[in-house]
Amino acid sequence: MIASHAAVVASAELLTSLYGERHRLCPTPNPELSLVLSCDRAIDLIELEQLCDAVGWSRRPLRRVREALEHSLLRVGLWRHDPRLPKLVGFARCTGDGIVEATVWDVAVHPLYQGAGLGKQLMVYVLDQLRAMEVDRVSLFADPEVVKFYAAQGWELEPQQRRCAFWYSP
């Protein structure tokens, strides 16, 4: 069945009202699952804490997490879409001057959603947003066991290949 033009417009308007103008739908192998990336929707601190718990990160005081988010150049959420209550299942944030350089921190995808290419889609979205700001150089720090994930996406590893990788605007 083909959706009517009005239904498609209503759906697009709903997504924009929930996630903002810069949202992006993520392709998924499951047609019943809708995932949305956005840097416009506010990040709920409790949901972020639950995501961090799920990926095994230590807890930080929520006051400090809120301050870190407020001082970040870019905050990106990946939500499992539900018109009543979207659920945060992925996250990344960037710091920097927003002109020349940025650093990516705290990239996480909930374990139930890992292995489907969502981390890659999250990072592509982050880089697209930084490109739109005309940021030329991006660095990131990651745990040693995931640095190869970034290398496979074209990030240049630091010489020791331990924790840091770089991306340069073409």
Where are each of the predicted segments found?
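Short amphipathic alpha-helix that is part of the acyltransferase structural core
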Residues: 5, 9-63, 85, 161
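Conserved catalytic-core motifs of GNAT/GCN5-like acyltransferases
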Residues: 20, 139-141, 151, 156-170
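A conserved beta-strand-loop-helix scaffold within acyl/acetyltransferase catalytic domains
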Residues: 63-84, 88-108
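Residue-level recognition of the GNAT/N-acetyltransferase active site
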Residues: 110, 143
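Conserved acetyl-CoA pyrophosphate-binding loop and the N-cap/start of the following alpha-helix
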Residues: 113, 117-125
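Conserved GNAT acetyl-CoA-binding A-motif
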Residues: 123, 128-142
